[in-house]
A protein has these predicted regions:
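Beta-strand-rich ligand-recognition modules
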Residues: 57-81, 310, 317-370
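Aromatic-lined ligand-binding clefts that engage carbohydrates, nucleic acids, or primary amines
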Residues: 266-267, 293-321, 350-352
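Short beta-strands within extracellular/lumenal beta-sheet-rich domains
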Residues: 24-28, 283-296, 333-336, 417
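Short, aromatic- and glycine-rich surface loops/edge beta-strands on solvent-exposed regions
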Residues: 81-91, 351-352, 614-620
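Surface beta-strand/loop "capping" patches
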Residues: 34-36, 281-284, 521, 525, ...
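C-terminal beta-sandwich/jelly-roll accessory domains of carbohydrate-active enzymes
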Residues: 566-654
């Protein structure tokens, strides 16, 4: 067990005037993992032993503080039950009340895990769900978002600590986490504690410790940068300002485009929106967007606001050649102030240098109002409409962009340091993980990153706990013909992790996504499928926990016979029609849609265009049209029988 160091600024327990101070992990309404030796730690100003009395067995445990007052002991927890209390005393006792013993699950990842029951996102039937959200045996602990360059032992929690599950407390809590916990509480008849530690728009490498991430050659430099980063914000800002100055000098040498006027190489496109046109479809790098407007006389020498909404991915924005703002990350709304000294009557040019680091680029804007420049709420000029746009420097030719170490949660290791490390070694049953949209463009690299994270966390906890992955759901417009797909490659990376790691599972979500929304609303089904894995593998239920999985195949002439496992009572389709989503290729490696037939636990494939088949793919698309499932209507996992190099092979930029 690692040494626990508790900072003096940890939350004061509000149960009296004791000198003992505890983490938000140890508050009223907490849940402790059943039948284990659970650690309890804190800090005291005294030099003598701290006593911990557990009401379930009336046993007293003693812990000697070290020279700095830090203490830790382990208490033996019974089978699920409660409520109980824990009394901790260094001379003045404090009591943690309404403690339940049950199952504790950590819920982590990016925005689809952070997606609330009702808040910035809204789940399916959210109002009805909130009406029925009072669950005495479900407790919630929500870690506040924060990032630090070095491992922390303290954190802040929403509401200060554990909260009873209610319409009020669960509204802003992870929907996937809540629905998962509800399924476990109902089916296993145990109290459930849920810890949410998630942050939207974050890559997996932000959640890995520097100890582990530094072992990957792709991240040695980035990890060392964070290790060298000062902790205090003013010094960190100075550090970053120097990095940006150096970066801009390097970039100017290769991209000397005017920031005032567009030129003849520009084309006209409508904004706001993503640039999905063929010219930009496969381009990552620098894209310039220009808009000329007329500033009225009444606005002269007055401060203005430029409201651009979200931009994909990073931007530097100019007004008449002057930098007025910059921001990294597509999930942030841009609102930039324009200095009154820059504002003159007449023509003015807004120039935006977008750095696209993956997927489509664009000025995404707002859902409910125009992008605009404004004097005040009553006086604004819409910027919706035609912009002059051109691409310049591909990403591969751009010097590495330093990430803002104060505001950019994509920085390596920083979320582990601030949002995971402080939870260790609190006893947990396992982890559910919904993350990956931010790593899609590096799917092959993810084959190494996700297993690394799992090993990292298991080592820190000294516990090979179960780890269940939510496979990315279908997203983007459907494609008419078979082709390559970064999202399919990413799902493959997730599936390979589950295949090759012990006590790891993956829930297939290929049928419950939304073509137009990266945050599908049906979080109940996401959670149900994750809970099926836990119920089958950790709680001993004899249930079908997943959909069909490709096992092997036989080629017979111009036909291919595919064999599947996890078929329950046999293969079927979700809509009762012939299986769709299968593509077949011959020696030329060109895929065609296949004719299909189900026979028991096999699917027979053929195509008149492929006389000598050598490879099969199923659901191999961002948003595939597929329908094969088992008798429980759980979908078949996407797969391919080939190992031909994919679109993301070799992508390491982050």
């Amino acid at each position: 067990m690692r040494t626990i160091i508790i900072a003096l600024s940890l939350l004061y327990c509000l149960h009296g005037q004791s000198e003992v101070r505890l983490s938000p992990l140890f508050t009223d309404n907490m849940v402790m993992q059943q039948t284990t030796d659970a650690p309890i730690w804190g800090i005291t100003n005294t030099k003598h032993a701290v006593s911990i009395i557990t009401s379930w067995d009336k046993k007293t445990y003693n812990a000697m503080p070290d020279k700095d007052g830090h203490f830790i002991t382990h208490v033996s927890t019974p089978k699920a039950g409660g409520p109980y209390s824990i009394t901790i005393s260094d001379g003045t006792p404090i009591t943690i009340d309404n403690v339940l013993i049950g199952e504790v699950w950590l819920c982590s990842g990016q925005s689809n895990m952070d997606f609330p029951v009702k808040g910035w996102g809204q789940t399916k039937n959210c109002d009805e769900e909130l009406k029925n959200a009072d669950h005495y045996r479900i407790r919630l602990l929500h870690v506040n978002n924060t990032m630090r360059p070095h491992a922390q032992t303290e954190f802040e929690a929403v509401g200060g600590g554990w909260q009873l599950c209610s319409a009020e407390t669960v509204a802003g809590f992870s929907a996937v986490g809540y629905f998962f916990g509800r399924d476990i509480e109902l089916n296993e008849n145990v109290p459930v504690g849920l810890i949410e530690s998630a942050w939207g728009g974050t890559p997996v490498e932000a959640w890995i410790s520097s100890e582990f991430l530094s072992t990957m050659s792709d991240f040695k430099k980035a990890t060392q940068r964070i290790i060298n980063m000062p902790d205090d914000i003013p010094t960190r800002k100075h550090f970053y300002d120097e990095e940006i100055t150096s970066f801009e000098k390097q970039l100017k040498n290769i991209d000397d485009n005017s920031v005032i006027n567009a030129d003849e190489t520009c084309n006209r496109y409508l904004l706001p929106g993503l640039l999905t046109q063929k010219e930009f479809a496969d381009f990552d790098g620098i894209i310039w967007c220009y808009k000329t407007i007329g500033i009225p006389h009444s606005w002269q020498n007055k401060e203005l606001k430029l409201r651009l909404g979200m931009i994909d991915d990073n931007d530097v924005t100019y007004f008449n050649g002057k930098v007025i703002g910059r921001m990294d990350g597509y999930a942030e709304n841009r609102v930039y102030s324009i200095n009154a000294d820059f504002v003159k009557e007449g023509k003015a040019t807004i120039a935006i240098r977008i750095m696209d680091i993956g997927g489509y680029a664009g000025i995404v804007g707002y859902k409910d109002h125009d992008i605009c420049i404004e004097l005040d709420a009553e006086n604004s000029i819409s910027l919706n409409g035609e912009w002059l746009i051109k691409k310049t420097i591909p990403l591969a030719d751009i010097p590495e962009l330093p990430r803002n170490p104060i505001t950019d949660a994509k920085n390596v290791c920083m979320l582990y340091n601030a949002m995971i490390n402080p939870l260790v070694p609190f006893s947990i049953k396992g982890v559910i993980w919904y993350q990956g949209e931010d790593n899609v463009n590096r799917a092959y690299q993810y084959r190494e990153l996700l297993p690394l994270l799992i090993e990292d966390w298991r080592k820190q906890w000294n516990n090979r706990f179960p780890f269940y992955i939510a496979q990315l759901a279908n997203y983007h417009p459907k494609q008419k013909e078979p082709g390559e797909s970064k999202w399919a490659e990413f799902r493959e990376a997730q599936h390979l992790t589950a295949k090759h790691k012990d006590n790891v599972g993956v829930a297939c979500l290929i049928d419950i996504g939304d073509a137009n929304d990266i945050h599908p609303a049906n979080k109940q089904e996401v959670a149900r499928r994750l809970a099926l894995l836990a119920r089958a593998y950790n709680y001993g239920e004899q249930i079908e926990s997943s959909g069909p999985v490709y096992n092997n195949h036989v080629i017979s002439g111009d036909k291919v016979i595919l064999h599947f496992i996890n078929t329950d009572k046999g293969l079927t389709t979700s809509d009762g029609k012939t299986p769709r989503g299968f593509a077949i290729a011959g020696l030329d490696h060109k895929f065609y849609w296949a004719e299909t037939e189900i026979k028991g636990n096999t699917v027979i494939l053929w195509s008149p265009k492929v006389k000598h088949p050598i490879a099969i793919r199923y659901a191999w698309a961002d948003n595939p049209d597929c329908n094969l499932c088992n008798s429980k209507l759980l979908p078949t996992y996407p797969f391919r029988t080939d190992d031909w190099p994919g679109m993301t092979l070799g992508n390491i930029a982050y």
